[in-house]
Regions:
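Active-site- and interface-proximal helix/loop "cap" or "latch" segments in soluble metabolic
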Residues: 1-166, 212-298
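Short, basic/aromatic recognition patches
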Residues: 207-211
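Short, compositionally biased leader-like segments
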Residues: 167-206
Length: 298
């Protein structure tokens, strides 16, 4: 057995970038956009969805960017249109793959782009302004988060009961702005995100890198994997920006417990057990999982 990256394509380095944005449509829908690019192609997707708590896909569209890859989902706009009526809930990726066709050329890349767009639905919402303080404290922001996205409860340390008392401590900083909770209709770039992933192969080791930067997050993650034994040799992370600086920090560093773990097809359960849950960080878990998803075991 060994661990391989299906995207190295005979080379020793693979890189992809993702840009994402949220616009607020005049009628109140959120337009979630993402562009995913690598050496093969670039694809743009957009989802018009109802804000929380609905998360209903009203419209979906997308297109390959020049140079268009030959033979890869040439009917992409038609296939994406079939996403209308779905909801951005757990299992959405699987539904997207079913709609695109799991064996269709380019389907995996498009599905990744659609999921990146869908994730932005948990960054911008439209709350009743009467529920939003003019000068919110960190605890107020947490209350707004749980009002908008109740599914966050116990999803990570920050949204667990164990962290509540910490919000009264000095030094807790929140980079979010009220525009993310009560954006005006027609607002452009209410939220924007940039991600970069890289996988390099050298001397029997795969080095995995992932970064994500937006208004409220700054993550950089590195993992070294032994190709033959499939063991994680080293793990490192930098988190210069977090939604609740002074609180989210306490869930970081759990990647160190991944060192020595042997990766196989069961990695999703193992990863969630180590870095997720009420003591963990779901963004950290997602970013790591996105890297591991690019691997296969032979």
């Amino acid at each position: 057995m060994s661990v391989v990256c299906r995207l190295l394509d005979g080379t020793d380095r693979y890189e992809r970038t993702v840009t994402g944005s949220v616009d607020v449509r005049p009628e109140g829908l959120l337009r979630l956009g993402a562009r995913l690019s690598d050496h093969r192609a670039s694809v743009d997707v957009s989802l018009d969805v109802t804000p929380s708590p609905g998360f209903d896909v009203v419209r979906a569209d997308g297109a390959w960017r020049p140079p268009e890859p030959a033979g890869q989902l040439e009917d992409l706009p038609d296939r994406l249109a079939r996403l209308a009526g779905l909801r951005l809930f757990p299992g959405f990726r699987r539904r997207v793959v079913d709609v695109l066709g799991p064996d269709a050329p380019g389907a995996a890349q498009v599905a990744d782009a659609v999921v990146e767009a869908a994730r932005l639905s948990r960054q911008v919402t439209r709350l009743d302004p009467r529920h939003v303080p003019a000068d919110p404290t960190p605890l107020d922001f947490r209350r707004l988060d749980l009002m908008a996205w109740p599914e966050f409860s116990d999803m990570c340390f920050t949204y667990s009961a164990a962290s509540t008392s910490l919000f009264e401590e000095p030094g807790v900083r929140v980079p979010a702005t009220l525009d993310m909770y009560v954006p005006r209709p027609g607002a452009r770039l209410a939220f924007h995100r940039y991600k970069r992933a890289e996988i390099a192969r050298a001397d029997g080791v795969l080095t995995l890198y992932q970064s994500m930067f937006d208004q409220v997050h700054g993550f950089e993650l590195w993992y070294d994997l032994d190709i033959q034994t499939q063991r994680i040799l080293r793990a490192r992370a930098l988190t210069p920006r977090l939604p609740y600086m002074g609180i989210c920090d306490q869930a970081q560093g759990r990647n160190q417990t991944l060192i020595g773990m042997t990766l196989d097809e069961r990695w999703p359960t193992a990863l969630r057990g180590v870095t997720g849950g009420r003591l963990g960080c779901f963004q950290f878990t997602d970013l790591t999982g996105d890297l591991f998803r690019l691997l296969s075991f032979e």
